[in-house]
From Swiss-Prot:
Gene3D superfamilies: Ankyrin repeat-containing domain, VPS9 domain. One of its GO terms (molecular function) is guanyl-nucleotide exchange factor activity. Pfam families: VPS9. GO terms for biological process: early endosome to late endosome transport. InterPro entries: Ankyrin_rpt-contain_sf (IPR036770), UPF0507/Ank_repeat_27 (IPR051248), VPS9 (IPR003123), VPS9_dom_sf (IPR037191). Transmembrane segments: none annotated. Residues 324-469 form the VPS9 domain. GO terms for cellular component: early endosome; late endosome; plasma membrane; transport vesicle; tubular endosome. Belongs to the UPF0507 family. This is UPF0507 protein PGUG_02975.
């Protein structure tokens, strides 16, 4: 023993709690004795809560941190009975669990074996009554632990729930209390001074302070009432000067201020209290301007009337009462300038990349300014904020070195106003200048904003000015030229270009319509592509090559979508134009080509994302594409290509794309979308053409998406037969993979798919089902096992699991019926090496309840156990033809248990004699066989323990390696992956153990039968001795009978009584001798039949073992090699 009490002579398990329970040499001593006894007696009624191994090794009990000596959690796990009992939960049928009434919510309250309570709900465990603190721990995994110790039943499995913390908490993983105290809750409530000043309005003050509302509500109601004759001017639609409207508003504002003043006068009701209240508010918010709040309150209540008056005045151009109410931007003017381009406004920007920047600013500014037309914008401050934001968008310098001067700003603002097409924009500006709180002239920036808009209005208010005429003419020329492109009028375009060439030659003016771009930033070249006008596109490029420089072409893009010419050409599928653009791109440097191809649009997509429109282009530009670049949906170009399910040449598309992508540096994980789908998940067909499965590394064929679907389950779910066939042949495939969320396996998805398929898809579904079942029978089941269990569901009416069998016969049976058939078989064949029902179903007792999260997982293991049972039956010589009949899986009915017992008894009562010599031979044979079987059993038990421990230690090794990598990343200031606490996976040893345990169970069964017969032999000898003794006594009576024969008719009464007593004694001896002789005959018959049966079963055992062990090794090799292939270790030399 080590100093700390832990065993030093056994292979320690890395998790201290599991090591204490399953690998404890002191299990028969306190404090472990009672715990071990409870677990051993009803191991299926308990579930062990397992904290992370690293946490137990490296953390302390939080309660001990305040004391002078800290207590490590691993010491509690080894020595503290309460800690151990607190992590063992009663989940059996007698655990008194309170389940949630809603089935979708997996929640239940359970008691630990020390009387504490936990709540299991929605993947979390919450500590409750009895625990020192209210904590919560996340459930990270569940599983079964195969026991290998001698003090638990052989082959027993214990349910484990893995969590991310201990139920005592830990020093490295602090958890807050579930419910805050009332004081803490009160502290979270915002105090008045925490309310932002900007969010305070006068209306809010009225709601929050009833005293203030009581003082001013009635006067304000009268002020804003429609019958208020004093301000009737605002309610009559007559032509009037704008100053009159402004004056009426000012008067109402003064009335509002007076209402506030009157409310705080000492002679008014509650005046003093109202005054004190307002002073208290102002002290709490020193930055609050009460006059501003009142102004905004009046403005909100009068907005509808004010705005209606302004609209009426600005609409009456024929009978204007005020020159300031002139409507400049009419619908006609907007139409006249609708095609105006930025290059035609004397903006000193020639570089195409800077022009793109300005066009994008204009587009964003148009969106912002268009908010003025929103009917919910009813305050001058909101309107001012909109035009202020518009100016800020145009002048921002965050991503550009371009400086915007005043003249440039006016030009940009003209574009914004003209293309936003806001009706009555003049009224909006007038409202801002005349109805806002304060004076604009006091703020220099606001004055600059307003003056900028005034300048735009001035420039566009004089249609007779040459500047406006030029803009109108330019807009008209743009419209006519773009219309020619869209209508494919090549002859007219040719004549127009010839005329332009004669007029300007190589040097086009900056404001020429050939260089014009619409509000989306689309040039004539872009419009030609959009309209699929190849002739015009070629004509524009070839008429005079000096008109469009290489920079003009490379930076020609739709500024709203950021799509360049090549992207649009691919989208429009204009292959000839695409080819021309590729030729032009070939004249650039390699760096320029890569930058152009991988520049992204508004959705984050590059040219590579659109190559599926012309997949032959991949061979030319594939080497330039960044295939790992993700768009906003996390699609890489390769991922996007694979999703083109309706492509006319999908196979060629996939083959071409993967031939360009696949290389030794190909990273499979990079091509995953935000839902966790890999390329294998979304590939419709052509998996062989892709060559993905031929890659030696980086390909995880078992990866799951956010819905816990693997590529295999996706192919089954969506009927992708071609991919399914190819994937089933891959050595890395985990065919029986179960997701960690619902524990569905491939057979569940086959069942789901079969139920969802309609009549048209039924043939496809049946074909998929056939492939899945055939693969399972080929790789997981021996040839002679023709029927296995695939699915099950719980029947609430029968309170039993209904099992679905598939094979030569498709049968549905209840689990209880299967167990009864097994029991009947054992009654009929008491000496069969097939174990008893209790041994086979040791871990799955009848009516055994488990935690809700364990239900599906436990059912999967039960089906697994049932199939292994069927496999073992198929390897028994007596069941070569139909092993499934043993469990009642045949069409013929089984006889009852009573009939089976009568048949066995009748067989045993048949006459048969065994001589002592024969008996000695039988005894010698059985004794020698028992000795050999015990030696084999001892070796088998050791081997099974080794298999179990080996699988656990492999998991421990992997856990230690992950913990080491986590610590190393923390030391290197890297972002480590989240530490996990998962169930030990199967490294192949668990699979081998599941079959080798049957060798152990059959040996135990044969030895038990041998011991039973040896006991019968002892009974036979004792009975034989009694028969000989009784026969000797009978001979003595018969000899004395002749001596007493002469006195038989004596009249002496006393002498006659003696003779009568001897006769009675003689009769009793005869009867006793007859009974013992009959019993001896039965024993002889039973021993002979049992001997023959056991001898046959020993022969069957040798044949059974010779078949089972190679099959078990084959399954071990399959699981182990699958893991090696999955991890890429098969390439190591």
């Amino acid at each position: 023993m080590a100093k700390d009490g832990r065993p030093s002579n056994l292979p320690l398990l890395y998790n201290p709690l599991l090591n204490c329970i399953f690998n404890n040499p002191n299990h028969s001593r306190a404090p472990y004795k009672q715990i071990i006894h409870e677990l051993a007696s009803r191991h299926t009624d308990f579930t062990i809560i397992v904290p992370p191994s690293s946490l137990l090794h490296n953390s302390y009990d939080p309660e001990s941190l305040k004391s002078s000596s800290k207590i490590a959690l691993h010491d509690l796990a080894y020595h503290n009975e309460e800690f151990i009992r607190s992590h063992i939960v009663k989940t059996g049928s007698n655990s008194h669990a309170f389940l949630a009434p809603v089935a979708k919510v997996q929640s239940a309250i359970y008691n630990t074996i020390c009387g504490k309570q936990i709540l299991v709900k929605n993947g979390m465990i919450f500590t409750g009554k009895g625990f020192r603190r209210s904590l919560r721990a996340k459930i990270t995994d569940i599983g079964y632990f195969d026991s290998f110790c001698d003090y638990f039943p052989s082959g027993s499995k214990f349910m484990l729930i893995y969590i991310d913390n201990s139920l005592y908490g830990s020093s490295d993983h602090p958890e807050p209390a579930l419910e805050a105290s009332p004081k803490a809750q009160q502290a979270k409530i915002k105090r008045p001074d925490q309310v932002p000043t900007e969010s305070i309005t006068f209306e809010r003050l009225l709601r929050n302070f009833p005293l203030l509302s009581k003082s001013v509500s009635d006067p304000f109601y009268q002020l804003f009432h429609h019958n208020n004759y004093q301000f009737r001017v605002l309610r009559t639609n007559t032509h009037k000067k704008l100053s009159v409207i402004k004056s009426e508003f000012d008067n109402m504002l003064e009335e509002a201020y007076q209402i506030i003043s009157n409310s705080v006068k000492s002679d008014s009701p509650d005046g003093e209290q109202t005054n004190n209240l307002l002073h208290q508010i102002l002290r709490s918010y020193p930055e609050l301007d009460l006059n501003k709040l009142v102004h905004e309150y009046v403005e909100i209540n009068l907005y509808d009337k004010l705005w209606a008056q302004l609209i009426f005045q600005f609409s009456a151009n024929a009978g204007l009462a005020d020159p300031d109410a002139t409507k400049i931007f009419t619908a006609e003017k907007y139409d006249e300038l609708s095609c105006l381009s930025l290059n035609q406004l004397d903006i000193p920007v020639d570089e195409p990349w800077l022009l793109n920047d300005l066009l994008l600013r204009v587009y964003n500014a148009i969106i912002e300014l268009s908010k003025l037309a929103d009917a919910t914008i009813i305050e001058s401050s909101s309107k001012l904020k909109i035009i202020s934001n518009t100016i800020s968008i145009l002048t921002e310098n965050s991503n550009s070195s371009l400086m915007i001067d005043a003249d440039t700003l006016i030009g940009l603002l003209i574009m914004v106003v003209v293309h936003s097409k806001i009706d009555f924009i003049e009224a909006h500006l007038y409202y801002i200048k005349n109805f806002m709180y304060g004076t604009i002239s006091d703020d220099g920036y606001l004055s600059f904003i307003i003056s900028s808009f005034d300048a735009v209005f001035f420039h566009l208010s004089h249609p007779d000015e040459p500047q406006y005429a030029d803009m109108k003419e330019s807009s008209q020329k743009n419209f006519e030229f773009w219309s020619l492109i869209r209508s494919h009028k090549v002859d007219e375009i040719t004549a127009l270009l010839e005329e332009t060439d004669k007029l300007y030659g190589d040097k086009l003016p900056h404001n020429h319509f050939l260089k014009a771009r619409n509000i989306n930033g689309e040039s004539a070249l872009m419009l030609a592509i959009r309209s699929k006008n190849y002739d015009t596109f070629l004509l524009l490029l070839s008429r005079n090559p000096n008109w469009f420089s290489i920079e003009d072409i490379l930076f020609d893009r739709n500024t709203t979508t950021s799509q360049n010419l090549l992207m649009v050409s691919l989208m429009e599928e204009t292959k000839i134009i695409t080819k021309i653009l590729i030729e032009i791109l070939g004249s650039c440097t390699l760096e320029e080509q890569i930058a152009y191809i991988n520049s992204t649009d508004y959705s984050g997509r590059s040219v590579g994302h659109y190559l599926f429109h012309d997949y032959e282009l991949i061979n030319e530009v594939g080497h330039l594409v960044n295939w790992e670049l993700k768009d906003h949906n996390s699609y890489t170009p390769l991922f996007n290509i694979c999703r083109c399910y309706d492509h006319y040449a999908y196979y060629d598309l996939i083959k071409t794309a993967f031939s360009a992508v696949m290389s030794p540096n190909f990273n499979f994980k990079k091509h995953t979308d935000k839902y966790g789908n890999s390329i294998l998940h979304i590939l419709l067909k052509g998996i062989d053409q892709s060559g993905l499965l031929k890659a030696d590394k980086n390909i995880n064929v078992n990866c799951t998406n956010s819905k816990c679907l693997t590529p295999l389950t996706v192919y089954v779910k969506y009927g992708r037969i071609e991919n399914l066939i190819s994937l089933l042949q891959d050595k890395r495939l985990e065919f029986m993979f179960e997701d960690k969320k619902n524990f569905f396996n491939i057979f569940d998805y086959v069942a789901f798919s079969s139920r969802k398929q309609g009549d048209n898809d039924r043939g496809n579904s049946e074909e998929i089902t056939s492939f899945i079942y055939s693969h399972y029978f080929k790789h997981f089941i021996p040839l002679k096992c023709t029927t296995v269990a695939f699915n099950a569901k719980f029947d609430t009416t029968k309170k039993d699991w209904i099992v679905y069998f598939h094979g030569n016969q498709n049968i549905i049976l209840g689990l209880d019926s299967i167990k009864q058939s097994h029991h009947s078989f054992k009654l009929k064949n008491p000496h069969s090496l097939i174990p008893d029902v209790e041994k086979v179903w040791l871990n799955y007792p009848a009516n055994g309840s488990v935690a809700p999260i364990f239900a599906k997982f436990r059912m999967n293991r039960l089906l697994e156990n049932l199939n292994i049972f069927l496999v073992c039956l198929s390897m028994h010589p007596n069941f070569d033809t139909a092993p499934h009949e043993t469990l009642g899986l045949s069409s013929s009915g089984n006889s009852s248990s009573l009939d089976q017992m009568k048949e066995v008894i009748g067989k045993q009562e048949s006459s048969s004699k065994v001589t002592p010599h024969q008996l000695a031979e039988i005894e010698t044979f059985l004794s020698l066989s028992k000795e050999n079987l015990l030696g084999t059993l001892s070796t088998t038990i050791k081997f099974n323990k080794l298999m179990t421990v080996m699988n656990i230690k492999m998991g421990d090794l992997n856990t230690i390696r992950e913990d080491s990598l986590y610590s190393a990343k923390m030391l290197c200031d890297m972002t480590p992956s989240i530490k996990t606490n998962y169930h030990t996976p199967d490294y192949g040893y668990r699979t081998m153990f599941q079959y080798f345990i049957w060798v152990e169970l059959t040996l135990i069964e044969i030895i038990r039968n041998v011991n039973k017969v040896l006991g019968r032999i002892t009974d036979w000898r004792q009975c034989h001795d009694r028969v000989l003794s009784l026969a000797g006594e009978l001979r003595k009576y018969e000899d004395k009978r002749h001596e007493l024969g002469t006195d038989e008719h004596s009249n002496s009464s006393w002498f006659g009584n003696i003779i009568e007593n001897k006769r009675t004694r003689y009769k009793k001896l005869v009867l006793l001798h007859s009974e013992e002789t009959k019993k001896l005959g039965l024993l002889s018959n039973e021993i002979k039949i049992s001997h023959e049966d056991i001898a046959a079963e020993m022969s069957h055992y040798l044949m059974f073992r010779s078949k089972l062990i190679p099959f078990a090794i084959k399954q071990f090799t399959r699981v182990a090699t699958t893991g090696l292939n999955r991890n890429g270790l098969h390439v190591l030399q």
